């Protein structure tokens, strides 16, 4: 191979090693003595060690290594057969990357190796070092680079030991470890195949204290290594130990563990190797010493295998005898190749191998057939192994030459095929060292010896090389034993041929050694370690003596070793004594017993499982391949068939296209006719329904006007019938017309099975689709028609009777005719009549005819001509035609036939009757009385039957009605009893609460504080007011009763309520006691305060009527009502009661709460800790006010990032519950979001006082902030809110429960009572009576203090509220009407009455209507538009890169380009262009412009005289030179010249205006008629006055009409630059640029610039020399100019909205009067539009909405307050309505109002609050006649509700408040529907509600709806469970807690892992903390509805 170092080597000869050119060839020796002949089975030449140029020096160093000490020498021979020094130490192959470390088995830690080979970095991993990189040919080629070694050829040459310690041929590795090395990651403890290095220094050798086993094994080294496994063991020049893993002798075969085991030594070896690998433990040489000599085997096994082992041993000896040189053969070869000199082989110092062979070699028998070709790394020390291991890995049987097997293969059958797959690591291992050829293997072949051994030619017994060396292995192993007879081959299992490894037999000479070792080392069978030798089989007992002579081996030419001079080298031989010693040692080794083979059952089972798995894999691969082949074949055939199918389809289409087209057209025509008929039917039904409804209304009117009850019932029945008819007609209209299904597909699913086609066919059967009592398509005959027919028959009969009178009523036959006629269509089912077996009337003869007709109808589609056409397409079309006929036409024809038949039959019957009467007329005279009697009897019987049936039916109906009434009454009674019980329970709960409130109210005197006022008018009104009735209950002084918590013990069914009253009293007392106890014990641990007197706050009962003065710490003066509020708050604190300060907004709730904290710090020395929780927008406001009012307080602003808050938490003092003045902080201010985020830290603190600002944020008891704050350890809580009630009573309950959890959470019924919303409570009664109002107000009074501005603040004027109504514009009306047309009135009524859960669709309609009312541009914005530009523009990657001044060049070009070749454009293509290639360029100019030109001066001069051609020039004022120049100038130049030429003739008309000079014209200008009559000079001198207007009438009219300022009505669809000629020539580009960018032409068109004109004036250039003015006229459109880009008009933007137009007028007036405006919006998009409007009007403004950051909010508010030039403040209603002081504004405008009046009240109180000195005016813009009017009406209703509940007074209507406008929460659709409906529709909704309520259907429907909603809500879960009306109404609007600030969420500092808080990412009120806990850490952004709901506290986060 070219990448290996080459040396002078002898090429290998054919058949020199006995392989006949097949298999691995032996190592060819280089120049030097001829090597001895190899063994008959072929020498294993080492192809792994090429000789490099630098190998000589290292080889000499290795040879000159000092001999080891005796301890080492005693163990060195142990590795004779396995340890071989490197041939020149070329490359050291290492096992793993851990090659620089050695591992001690006793202490498996890495130790640095003291010896490292210089080339060790080129090592290859061990698992692949022994694998041949190439095929056999490559192996043969590689042989030239290898030296023949004794071990490599299985010769007797003794190799030196490895440098890391002794190796033993008795310590082979397990195949499982080998398998692991080959197929898994490299083991760091496995040695690599590398040349053995020189012996290490003595410090690395084994200590002499460890003795070998039986004197044969070397002592274990100090740094033992892992046992190295190998399958078979053989010697190679690169092998250092027999314990080295052979690791895949060839890539052509699988590892040994792959092959099937057999009951042989090979099977046991394989199982041992596999089992040892599973253990995974380190090898312990001490344990191996005892386990190595164990086990026994029957002697018959030894007898059976003796012959073959003898043969193997003889072969070994003969091969070794031919190589008796002590390792000098390969060494000499290497050195010779390196030095290129002939050298004397005997002048060298003995090598380490020679040294080892001369010391105690009689004690180290060697089995050369078990050597490995893999060398251990230089830094590994292999532990001494037992000799039994060598026998457990038997030598391979020499394969016959005819097999051609590889010597190093371990496969049972050795083939020469290339490897099926090579591991990438193997390839990398092969190529790791390009100079190393040691990648082959020298393992003995383990193939089965299926061929008889007789084919092997015996070797010669006389070998001259025996005398070469006495101590050589050739003399030791060679003997004269004859070759044993061949062993019978075992039968091969055809399934397991490739899986069974070969057996290897052992010699019998090891029996003595086994006994000897048993004496020295007893066996330890219970050793827990997993040992390779433990599981091996014992040596067979019977063996043939080793001294027997074998048959002569076949003659093989063995190359003789040669000396330096070329003469043959004499071989050394062993003495007889040494040979006898060696033979005895080998006998002792072979007689050693092996473990029993039964111990390998588990390994056998595992091997079989792997074999089965491999077989399954192969089968699956074959199956996949077969499937792939089938699929490919199918695809090919399908392509072929597809061609034929396509051809057939095309041919069929060509043949049948015309017929199919005609059929389709006819079908479409028929369908159109049917559609028209359906529409006619629909219109008739609608008209009939309208008529019926009118009849119903008339009947109802008559019923209401009727006086008699019977008459009223009659009219009511008529109305009911009409109503039923209307309902039926409506149902028909909704479900469609029942008939042929023309509009439904044929394969639409049918719920009853089958398809729609079969379903329709069943429905379309004749006889089943006919209506009840219908004979045909004609309408049923009325009674009058029938009576007329009867009268006609009677008249005919009378005429026949010749005047004889017939009886007055002859009904017998008439009745029979009637029955026959009406019953005939019903008796189509003959089978039914047969089953009933009833007597048939004379109508029976008609039945057979009907049957015949039906049979014909069924058989009609069967046409015999159909059988002639068998094509599929024809049959499909044919079947479709007949199917359509059967579906549509057959039924119609059948009905026509039936009608015709019935008419004919009726006529025939009548004729027959008349005929019979005429025939029997003579009998009538005698039988007339009898027949009359019979007829009357039949009629009477029929009437009686009808009467009794009707009577029975009425009785049955009455009975059912009575039963139903009884059930209804029972249900009502049960409901009444339950209601009474619930009422008593509710009364008990309310009484308990009332008692508690009464006791507290007496102490804290809330009523007195509320009534206090400083307004004189209010004081007078209070005096005149009648005091309310209050509870007069004495406080019990006796012992407190037991608290009742189990309500099941109370009897709520009893009438006596004394027990309940007593229990309520006890519960109220216990609640008070618990509150007081909690207040006492809060600071009990460290409270050392004054415990005497009235000021002891820990004794709440001792507080008297003490007036508290204003604290001195407070740097402001409190007003009187604020001081009373302070007293009330202190009183609450003393009693341990929490409260709600609900003063109206703007009355100073903040300063009152600050004064409480100052009072506690001043009086009781309680400086904290105080906690203030406020919305994010008011945090800075709180901090500023606390610092301003109480500077002594240390305020800790707790917000910022997670890291900032972590630092702030260091100031917390959790050890003390009461802070002193020197505490780190006194008041902490934070937001609701951070409280939830860092709830774990807040709950660890004990807070003296917690103040919640804008407490409506916790109005939802389901929100996480409510739950978190409720769990804080606080002595007192104070809620600040200006609107305690916002939507319903459930929110109020949430606040009350928060301040008193022990009372208001006493039972679930109390919560349910509040949550049911008192507005809709009281047994479906919508009136809340006075008693309930008073009791509710009594509950609220003690805990809530509320004052309004008009009572307490006389200097604050009232606010004036005005509703400004606006009209819809034309565009708004069109859009509003379009939306209204999309609303179904019926759906609206149904959703409003039934409470459907689908509120999103209705609210979406509400949002659309609101957008229309606000501005139409909210739907579709009129943006800047331009036509489609059909061109290309240049682009730039970044304008920033272009700089501040960007040069925009003309880069536009059309997408259409006219490309011309350069040949046409430049190279002579254009004939008039001169050039090198154009020889005719000047012809046109020469002849046409010069010679043939008639305009030359010479020709003109000659043609001037007389009447010649140019005689007219004398009258045109033109010279012949001017005419010549004009003919040679282009059109543009002539136009410019004419524009600069002065018209003197027109001025003559102005100068000479006398009559005689009127028509004067100079003679030389007689032809200048236009110039003479030009009026332009006259118009130019008369620019002003009436004359100027008359002279410039077009210009003045155009300017006055404003056409130039109008917007363009039409715009072009597209625009494109001119098409350019493209040519690959620079001249073409220059020419095009000269045309497009002609500077003189542009100068003439556009005139001089302003700078040039200025320069002309400054330079005083005379006007005559001025450049010509701009010839390009001014554009007609002043704004649009010459461009087609249209910009929307702001004027239209204002006028498109009625609100904006009205606001425009209002703002102009306010601006003139000096007002400042707060403008509130519900939609942020409307704020965006308003910004554009304000910019258009040049109004200064600022903006604040939910997206504004916290610091920006603060700065924006400060700017508006301090800068008067800012006219308008744009705010979002919900974002700008909390905690902002905007008193500098005196006008509030609501662009659109909120449906919740509380939101608007908060917004307007931003200006109407303390500090306001002006009159506040509030304007509401309401669009008339739209949804906004109804929303405003609903808001006023809610405002009344709140006023009544808070004040407790009566409403203006008296007798209670009408809450009919508010339904239950689950029917919020009614509110939305009432907004959408107009007055008439609202009336219909209420009427429908009343009807359902009276009938009882409303409750059923609502219950059903609630059940479905519960399931839906249960499935939804989480925060989507309850979506309030607020959330849907305010969709898209921001608010304060909507993010947009820089407060980051908690990160690593938050223990819950909650990140977020008040994050600025817009994630809502509570960052991502709880959201992450809910959703598992998802960072998905919340929707707008979720953020708004979180901000309001509606839903949990």
Swiss-Prot record:
Residues 666-735 form a coiled coil. GO terms for cellular component: Ino80 complex. Residues 1954-1967 have a biased composition (Gly residues). Residues 32-41 have a biased composition (Pro residues). Residues 12-25, 108-117, 264-276, 298-317, 500-519, 529-540, 709-723, 782-793, 824-858, 1891-1902, 1919-1933 have a biased composition (Basic and acidic residues). Residues 1702-1858 form the Helicase C-terminal domain. GO terms for biological process: chromatin remodeling; DNA repair; DNA-templated transcription; regulation of macromolecule metabolic process. It is an enzyme of class 3 (hydrolase). Pfam families: DBINO (PF13892), Helicase_C (PF00271), SNF2-rel_dom (PF00176). Keywords: Activator, ATP-binding, Coiled coil, DNA damage, DNA repair, DNA-binding, Hydrolase, Nucleotide-binding, Nucleus, Transcription, Transcription regulation. ATP binds at residues 1143-1150. Residues 49-64, 118-156, 203-230, 240-251, 411-420, 689-707, 794-806 have a biased composition (Low complexity). Residues 881-1006 form the DBINO domain. Residues 769-781, 1903-1914, 1970-1985 have a biased composition (Basic residues). SMART domains: DEXDc, HELICc. Its EC number is 3.6.4.-. Transmembrane segments: none annotated. It is found in: Nucleus. The DBINO region is involved in binding to DNA. ATPase component of the INO80 complex which remodels chromatin by shifting nucleosomes and is involved in DNA repair. Component of the INO80 chromatin-remodeling complex. Belongs to the SNF2/RAD54 helicase family. This is Chromatin-remodeling ATPase INO80. The gene is crf2-1.
